[in-house]
């Protein structure tokens, strides 16, 4: 039989549909899920679909069978949550591998029954994203904290994939990806286990875009996500969940144009309605899916939430005889990424006459910046982050980070700093260059970056074996790499040695390891000139010559260098140093230097250097005449003397140094300044602005309820429109917390030592639901807004929620849930609260929740206020209204009126539908 790699070129492959909603149709009980084996395991098991591979294999096999009968070519094993991380919620960690094995084994048995030479069937071992994230902090007060690490996730997924391969998987499907660092760890695990078993299975990747900004939950654009994947051997890339077909189609069209992989799509059966149900039928979805097929934008098509064998049968008929998508060529330019894509081609340039150039910011380097070293030593991370932020604002397209200092724990500091800047969207948008002479530091840094970063550096200094080992690590963790022109003999200082080492390294990397040459950046060693030693005078010229040779003879490779090394002899004379750098880059860029580690702010304009100075500096840089270095030293002394005299005169005259012009937003009213600061996450001016606001508002709490909450509401609106994305919202929340902390002493004074908490909120994901990422985000945002949060976690029974609410005397309760059964559990929780005499506000949120469901099902069974909250950024503002004695009655009245209107509209609509059904029943039967 043909394998999947052959068949995908010939036809559109049909992937199966939803598993969870199909399982629900069997109306399984808690006893069904437990079976005899897990009868005594504590907690609730219902909803843990993966355990049915062990306790009800008949149900799982039946679902597989029905999808195969419908025409599916690929059966997705029921193994989405077969990782220890996920099964820990059910106390079944030790059964995770067995579940994975059994899920794949059952699928293998059914696929083998249906396979024929003309239509072989394939098993996709399903790896879900887990409910943890490697890229985001669960703790608002500690942006560097992580709930799970790369290594922990890698270990758990290795165990899962090991079971999947042993069970008979033909493909590994990593799906519903919301965090690219999670995905990278999972790809790493899949490849590692394939090597163990001696197989090379195709890896399918399917991401989920979570907001209208078109980004993943962790903040990456689709293009940045593709860049992060580009070093890996990926079979297909696509999307699933979150969207129905019409909403997903523009993203799939884009992937089909730019992604050099087979393209997959398995959308939901439309978007959930207000009752958490999917309205699309197999018949209504068929023409939508036919558009994907007929327009040639997919190779693999299937279904996600709400789809069934009936849907898949329609898709299979639509795809029959249709041509699959033709995969586009791999890009001929380098892809790097942070939250955004950096494409190194003719579109990346500075205002000089070079075709392309990437500024690599040099100031986050403890070896090159005394200020940065001092800040890291003193744990002054906020100011250190400010240095990175300024570099990006000044034009750095990549940020170099180096923590190599004898008195620092370089590994810990590297991880801490990378995790911290990951929480700063204006920095995290650009790729990182992880710079260290210690390989364990580089490895630790690579495991912190969801984007495609650059390793600085590797070399042949310790021989080929170590060089190749390091290069394999670079490829394993999905990075590009700087290769120093350094070998076993030493550092290359001549043109001949530079090109000899570069050529040798290039062929080892490209021919022996299969590294993409576009991911190689050579550093032919920028060395100091004008040192007084004649043998150093030609260093810049030979670097430029080597750059040109590399550009012409090593296809795809790039060239970089630490530019400031060139002018080391002139340290203390900033003007001359920057002029030397400008002239050097002007000539080096012309012949192919496309990266440079520089101070982006200090870049000079070549055309604005005075003619006499320019000629002299070019004489030195290009080594055009003897004695030029001495002349430049004299010029440098003259310029420094004039600068020193000007400083002394200014000091003697008492003239203050000119202040930089204030940004435009600082000229607005204090309310607008505070709103802007929240939106952009700027903490620098909070103290003076809040001091000014306190002069204007009667009470400190009025500042919170006024301009600060106005700012938070604006952020909520922008997020809802897709004009802000989640990491920006989280940063806004941290800024809000900083503002509240400034106000706290004033609030305490006004309350004469009373509590400054805005209120105590209990949060829980309801019984039967293990999804908590959304809830965790709400907790972060709420705590930043000065609320005390009691987080009960996931799968929390109604009885526990009620008991804790009474014990802690909470002011409001937040209920979260992602899956449809959670809607019923929320109703039950409200009923239990009613029985217990609670009347505190309930906030409801989650993917399947809706205002209509609250109006129809929850509000009628509870006498306290209940509100549906659309997204995390709105909770604080809603709570503020509920807990304000003046606002609350008006707010509750508004809700009651709105719910009554929604109920009336719904019942009128249902009556019309019922009348139509009755009319059809009563039609005249003439045949």
Which residues does each predicted region cover?
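Domain-level signal for soluble alpha/beta catalytic cores
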Residues: 1-927
């Amino acid at each position: 039989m043909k394998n999947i790699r052959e068949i995908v070129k010939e036809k559109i492959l049909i992937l199966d549909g939803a598993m969870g909603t199909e399982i629900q149709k069997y109306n399984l009980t808690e006893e069904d899920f437990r079976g005899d084996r897990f009868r005594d395991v504590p907690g609730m098991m219902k909803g843990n679909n993966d355990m049915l591979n062990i306790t009800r294999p008949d149900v799982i096999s039946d679902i597989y069978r029905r999808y195969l009968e419908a025409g599916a070519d690929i059966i997705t094993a029921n193994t989405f949550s077969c990782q220890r991380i996920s099964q820990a919620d059910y106390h079944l960690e030790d059964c995770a591998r067995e579940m994975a094995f059994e899920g794949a084994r059952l699928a293998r048995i059914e696929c083998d029954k249906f396979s024929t030479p003309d239509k072989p069937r394939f098993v996709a071992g399903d790896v879900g994203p887990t409910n943890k994230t490697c890229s985001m902090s669960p703790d608002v007060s500690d942006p560097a904290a992580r709930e799970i690490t790369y290594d922990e996730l890698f270990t758990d997924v290795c165990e899962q994939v090991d079971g999947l391969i042993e069970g008979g998987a033909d493909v590994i499907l990593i799906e519903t990806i919301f965090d690219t660092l999670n995905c990278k760890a999972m790809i790493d695990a899949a490849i590692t286990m394939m090597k163990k078993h001696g197989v090379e299975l195709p890896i399918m990747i399917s991401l989920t875009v979570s907001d209208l900004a078109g980004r993943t939950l962790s903040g990456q654009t689709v293009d940045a996500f593709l860049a992060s994947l580009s070093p890996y051997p990926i079979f297909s890339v696509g999307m699933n969940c979150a969207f129905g077909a019409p909403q997903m189609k523009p993203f799939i069209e884009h992937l089909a144009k730019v992604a050099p992989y087979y393209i997959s799509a398995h959308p939901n059966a439309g978007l959930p309605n207000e009752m958490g149900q999917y309205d699309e039928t197999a018949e209504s979805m068929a023409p939508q899916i036919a558009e994907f097929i007929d327009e040639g934008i997919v190779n693999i098509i299937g279904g996600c939430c709400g789809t069934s064998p009936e849907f898949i049968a329609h898709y299979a008929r639509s795809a029959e005889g249709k041509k699959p998508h033709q995969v586009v060529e791999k890009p001929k330019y380098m892809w790097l990424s942070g939250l955004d894509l950096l494409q190194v081609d003719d579109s990346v340039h500075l205002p000089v006459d070079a075709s392309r150039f990437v500024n690599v910011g040099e100031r986050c380097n403890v070896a090159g910046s005394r200020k940065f070293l001092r800040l890291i030593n003193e744990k002054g991370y906020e100011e250190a982050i400010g240095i990175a932020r300024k570099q990006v604002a000044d034009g750095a397209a990549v940020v170099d980070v180096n923590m190599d200092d004898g008195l620092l724990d370089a590994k810990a500091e590297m991880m801490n700093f990378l995790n911290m800047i990951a929480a700063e969207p204006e920095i995290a948008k650009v790729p990182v260059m992880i710079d260290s002479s210690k390989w364990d530091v580089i490895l630790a840094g690579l495991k912190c970056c969801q984007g495609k970063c650059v390793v600085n550096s590797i070399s042949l200094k310790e021989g080929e074996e170590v060089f190749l080992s390091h290069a394999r690590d670079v490829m394993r963790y999905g990075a590009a790499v700087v290769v120093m022109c350094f070998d076993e003999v030493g550092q290359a200082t001549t043109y001949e040695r530079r090109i000899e080492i570069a050529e040798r390294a290039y062929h080892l990397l490209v021919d022996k390891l299969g590294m993409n040459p576009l991911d190689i950046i050579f550093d032919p060693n920028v060395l100091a000139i004008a040192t007084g030693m004649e043998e150093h005078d030609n260093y810049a010229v030979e670097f430029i010559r080597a750059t040109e040779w590399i550009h012409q003879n090593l296809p795809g490779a790039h060239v970089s260098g630490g530019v400031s090394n060139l002018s080391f002899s002139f340290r203390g004379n900033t003007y001359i140093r920057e002029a030397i750098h400008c002239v050097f880059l002007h000539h080096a860029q012309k012949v192919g230097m496309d990266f440079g580690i520089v101070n982006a702010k200090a870049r000079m304009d070549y055309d604005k250097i005075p003619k006499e100075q320019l000629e002299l500096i070019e004489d030195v840089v290009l080594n055009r005449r003897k004695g030029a270095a001495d002349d430049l030293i004299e010029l440098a002394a003259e310029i420094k003397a004039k600068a020193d005299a000007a400083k002394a005169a200014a000091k003697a005259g008492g003239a203050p140094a000119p202040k930089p012009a204030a940004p435009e937003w600082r000229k607005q009213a204090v309310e607008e300044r505070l709103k802007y600061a929240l939106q952009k996450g700027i903490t620098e001016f909070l103290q003076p602005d809040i001091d000014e606001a306190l002069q204007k508002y009667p009470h400190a709490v009025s500042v919170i309820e006024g301009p600060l909450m106005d700012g938070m509401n604006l952020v909520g609106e922008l997020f809802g429109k897709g004009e802000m994305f989640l990491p920006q919202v989280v940063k806004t929340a941290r800024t809000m917390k900083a503002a509240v902390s400034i106000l706290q002493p004033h609030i305490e004074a006004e309350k004469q030592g009373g509590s400054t908490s805005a209120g105590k909120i209990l949060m829980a994901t309801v019984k039967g639901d293990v999804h908590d990422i959304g809830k965790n985000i709400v907790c972060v945002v709420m705590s930043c807004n000065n609320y005390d949060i009691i987080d009960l976690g996931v799968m929390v029974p109604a009885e526990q929620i009620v008991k804790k609410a009474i014990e802690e005397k909470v002011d409001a309760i937040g209920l979260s849930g992602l899956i449809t059964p959670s809607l019923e559990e929320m109703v039950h929780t409200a009923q239990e609260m009613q029985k217990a005499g609670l009347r505190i506000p309930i906030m409801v949120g989650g993917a399947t929740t809706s205002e209509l469901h609250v109006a129809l099902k929850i509000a009628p069974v509870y006498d306290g206020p209940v509100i549906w909250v659309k997204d995390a950024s709105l909770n604080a503002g809603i709570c503020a209204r509920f807990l304000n004695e003046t606002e609350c009655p008006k707010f509750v009245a508004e809700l009651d009126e709105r719910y009554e209107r929604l109920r009336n509209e719904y019942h009128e609509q249902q009556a019309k539908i019922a009348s139509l059904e009755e009319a059809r029943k009563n039609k005249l039967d003439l045949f």
